[in-house]
Curated annotation (Swiss-Prot):
SUPFAM superfamilies: P-loop containing nucleoside triphosphate hydrolases
N-acetylalanine modifications at: A2
Keyword Acetylation assigned: yes
UniProt name for this protein: ATP-dependent RNA helicase DDX19A
Subcellular location: Cytoplasm; Nucleus, Nucleoplasm
GO cellular component, one term: membrane
Organism, as annotated: Homo sapiens
Reactions catalysed according to its record: ATP + H2O = ADP + phosphate + H(+)
Chain's gene name: DDX19A
EC number, UniProt record: 3.6.4.13
Residues that coordinate or bind ATP: Q118, S137, Q138, S139, G140, T141, G142, K143, T144, R428, R431
Role played: ATP-dependent RNA helicase involved in mRNA export from the nucleus. Rather than unwinding RNA duplexes, DDX19 functions as a remodeler of ribonucleoprotein particles, whereby proteins bound to nuclear mRNA are dissociated and replaced by cytoplasmic mRNA binding proteins.
C-alpha cells in the first residue's frame, strides 16, 4: 500500500496512541502525593449536559481502546431488498472467494473467522451485481474491516483514478479507517490511498491517481465539484461511515447528500451507523436507494445480576465518608465512581488519593488519546478506582469492575432521572456472568425523588444501606 505523507500521518497517529498508553501522565500536585490523579481545571461547575461528549470523540475513543473485537451475542436481523433472493451468511473468509492478496491481508490483521456483522454483511457487499446496504453496528464489531474489504475487492488496480469513496465525520476517524485500509491492503502494493481532508493541499486542476479516497464531507465535496480532483461519475463504491455522528455535525448531512447525487446510478452505496433513531433512518433512506438492511438486535441490558443499594447522606463530605466506610469493610477489586460535574470528580479523586487509593480520573477536558491511556491503565489494573463524569458511561468493558458507585445520580438537563444513563452506568458491573454491586449516594429530597423514580422505571427495589453499620456492609459483600 502506498505511503504518501497522509498515510504516514496514520502511522504517526498510531505511534502516538501507543506511546500514550505507556505514558506516565503527569499530575499536578494536590497537596501531598496524589497517586495517578490528573488534575483538571475547574473554573466553573459544568452541568451534566455540558459534560456529555460529542459523538465523534466518543467514537474515536471506542476505536482507540478496542484491542480486539467485541464478543457480540446480539441477534442479527437481515431485511433484504428482494425477499426472493437467497439469503446466506459465511463462516469463513475462504467462502467469499477473495483475491489471494486480500485474504492474506485479512489474516495478517488477526481475523480468523468473520464476526457476526461480517458473516451477514460481506456476502451482500461482495455480491454481483453490487447491492446497496444500510447496516447498524456498534464499535468493535468488525464493520470497518467489512466495508474496507468490499472497497478493496471492487477496485481495478490498473485504473489510476478514484473508484471508491469513503466519508468519515472527522479527520481523526478518517485516519483510523485509513489505517485499516493500509493494513488490509499491504499485500496489494498497486492500490493507493488518498486523504481528502482539510490541509491536504493539491494544485488546482490536478487529477488524483489513487483508487481509494477517504475524507470528510466538506473537503470531498470540494474535490468532486469545485476543484474537480475527483470525477464522481467513475466512483464504484460509496461508503458513508458513522452516519449517526455525521448528522450530528452541522452541514455534513447536506454535503453527504450533495456528494451522493453526483454519483452514477450503478454505484454501490454502503451506510453504517451505531444507532438507528428516526433522524439517522431518514438520512440513510435519502442516500441509499433500494437497500438491504442489517440491524443488530440490542441485547437487553439487565439489572438481574446487580445488587442495588442507596445510602442516605446530608452533604458531600458525608457521601465521601460513606464511601470510605464501604472501602474499609469489603474487598473491592476495581470500582467506577460517577460524578455529576468535573469539579466534584476532581475533588473526589484527590480526596481518595489522600486516603491511599490508586485513583484515575477521566474527564471531558482531556484529549481523546489521554482518555484512552487512562482507560488502558485502569483496564490493566494499575489504578483500582476510576472516577469519571458521563464521558465514560458507555463502551468500556473492564472485567474486574465489581462495584459501581453513583456519587451523584444521573439526571437529564431538565433535572429528571436519566434512566438510560443509570442503566449504562451500573451495567459496568454484573457483566461476564458475575454478580455486581451498585451503590447510590442520596443527599437531598430531590435526589431521593430521583431514586424513587428510577426504582419505578425499572420496577426494581433499591435497598437502603447503613454504611455506619459494619455488619450490614459485610452482609452485602457475601
Amino acid at each position: 500500500m502506498a505511503t504518501d505523507s497522509w498515510a504516514l500521518a496514520v502511522d504517526e497517529q498510531e505511534a502516538a496512541v501507543k506511546s500514550m498508553t505507556n505514558l506516565q501522565i503527569k499530575e499536578e500536585k494536590v497537596k501531598a502525593d496524589t497517586n495517578g490523579i490528573i488534575k483538571t481545571s475547574t473554573t466553573a461547575e459544568k452541568t451534566d449536559e455540558e459534560e456529555k461528549e460529542d459523538r465523534a470523540a466518543q467514537s474515536l475513543l471506542n476505536k482507540l481502546i478496542r484491542s480486539n473485537l467485541v464478543d457480540n451475542t446480539n441477534q442479527v436481523e437481515v431485511l433484504q431488498r428482494d425477499p426472493n433472493s437467497p439469503l446466506y451468511s459465511v463462516k469463513s473468509f475462504e467462502e467469499l472467494r477473495l483475491k489471494p492478496q486480500l485474504l492474506q491481508g485479512v489474516y495478517a490483521m488477526g481475523f480468523n473467522r468473520p464476526s457476526k456483522i461480517q458473516e451477514n454483511a460481506l456476502p451482500m457487499m461482495l455480491a454481483e451485481p453490487p447491492q446497496n446496504l444500510i447496516a447498524q453496528s456498534q464499535s468493535g464489531t468488525g464493520k470497518t474491516a467489512a466495508f474496507v474489504l468490499a472497497m478493496l475487492s471492487r477496485v481495478e488496480p490498473s485504473d489510476r483514478y478514484p473508484q471508491c469513496l469513503c466519508l468519515s465525520p472527522t479527520y481523526e476517524l478518517a485516519l483510523q479507517t485509513g489505517k485499516v485500509i493500509e493494513q488490509m491492503g499491504k499485500f496489494y502494493p498497486e492500490l493507493k490511498l488518498a486523504y481528502a481532508v482539510r490541509g491536504n493541499k493539491l494544485e488546482r486542476g490536478q487529477k488524483i491517481s489513487e483508487q481509494i479516497v477517504i475524507g470528510t464531507p466538506g473537503t470531498v465535496l470540494d474535490w468532486c465539484s469545485k476543484l474537480k480532483f475527483i470525477d464522481p461519475k467513475k466512483i464504484k463504491v460509496f461508503v458513508l461511515d458513522e452516519a449517526d455522528v455525521m448528522i450530528a455535525t452541522q452541514g455534513h448531512q447536506d454535503q453527504s447528500i450533495r456528494i451522493q447525487r453526483m454519483l452514477p446510478r450503478n454505484c454501490q452505496m454502503l451506510l453504517f451507523s451505531a444507532t438507528f433513531e428516526d433522524s439517522v433512518w431518514k438520512f440513510a433512506q435519502k442516500v441509499v436507494p433500494d437497500p438491504n438492511v442489517i440491524k443488530l438486535k440490542r441485547e437487553e441490558e439487565t439489572l438481574d445480576t446487580i445488587k442495588q443499594y442507596y445510602v442516605l447522606c446530608s452533604s458531600r463530605d458525608e457521601k465521601f465518608q460513606a464511601l470510605c466506610n464501604l472501602y474499609g469493610a469489603i474487598t473491592i477489586a476495581q470500582a467506577m465512581i460517577f460524578c455529576h460535574t468535573r469539579k466534584t470528580a476532581s475533588w473526589l479523586a484527590a480526596e481518595l488519593s489522600k486516603e491511599g487509593h490508586q485513583v484515575a480520573l477521566l474527564s471531558g477536558e482531556m484529549m481523546v488519546e489521554q482518555r484512552a491511556a487512562v482507560i488502558e491503565r485502569f483496564r490493566e489494573g494499575k489504578e483500582k478506582v476510576l472516577v469519571t463524569t458521563n464521558v465514560c458511561a458507555r463502551g468500556i468493558d473492564v472485567e474486574q469492575v465489581s462495584v459501581v458507585i453513583n456519587f451523584d445520580l444521573p439526571v437529564d438537563k431538565d433535572g429528571n432521572p436519566d434512566n438510560e444513563t443509570y442503566l449504562h452506568r451500573i451495567g459496568r458491573t454484573g457483566r461476564f456472568g458475575k454478580r455486581g454491586l451498585a451503590v447510590n449516594m442520596v443527599d437531598s429530597k430531590h435526589s431521593m425523588n430521583i431514586l424513587n423514580r428510577i426504582q419505578e422505571h425499572f420496577n426494581k427495589k433499591i435497598e437502603r444501606l447503613d454504611t455506619d453499620d459494619l455488619d450490614e456492609i459485610e452482609k452485602i459483600a457475601n
